[in-house]
């Protein structure tokens, strides 16, 4: 497949994600998908991950800022926003709704095989995300180092 075709698959996936169309994942994600970021395998566990995220952040949206493809890999940078209005499981701990709006930049790397996402990695600033939710706070020393964030 060409780089443009691979980018089109990723765009369709993010569009399906933003529209909460998990059924379309069946056409876009390999049954034996490997999710390195969340250490899981398989399409169904991948879909379950998103279903749980949608419960915690029903308005979560990812806007593509940049997308690059080479060979069978696609890199995409998204600006994600959402409001924590539902219960969300955070590392095995249930986090009740905070009502806080969050935003974060995320980079995904996907390997495409047979016109589907076959393998994926994710890079984001989880520390800042947790700070925005109010789950963690700076220490007094941290507040002095980063007063604009404290």
What is the role of each PLM region?
Residues 1-150:
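C-terminal and inter-domain tail/linker signature
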């Amino acid at each position: 497949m060409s780089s443009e075709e691979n980018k089109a698959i990723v765009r369709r996936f993010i569009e399906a994600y933003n529209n909460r169309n998990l059924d379309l994942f069946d056409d876009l994600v390999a049954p034996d998908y490997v999710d390195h970021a969340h250490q899981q395998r398989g399409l169904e566990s991948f879909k379950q991950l998103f279903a749980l995220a949608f419960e915690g952040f029903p308005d979560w949206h990812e806007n593509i800022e940049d997308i690059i493809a080479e060979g069978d890999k696609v890199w995409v940078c998204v600006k994600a926003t959402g409001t924590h209005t539902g219960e969300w499981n955070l590392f095995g701990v249930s986090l009740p709704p905070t009502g806080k709006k969050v935003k974060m930049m995320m980079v995904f790397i996907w390997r495409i095989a047979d016109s589907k996402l076959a393998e994926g990695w994710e890079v984001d600033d989880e520390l800042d995300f947790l700070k925005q939710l109010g789950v963690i706070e700076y220490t007094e020393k941290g507040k002095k180092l980063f007063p604009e964030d404290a």
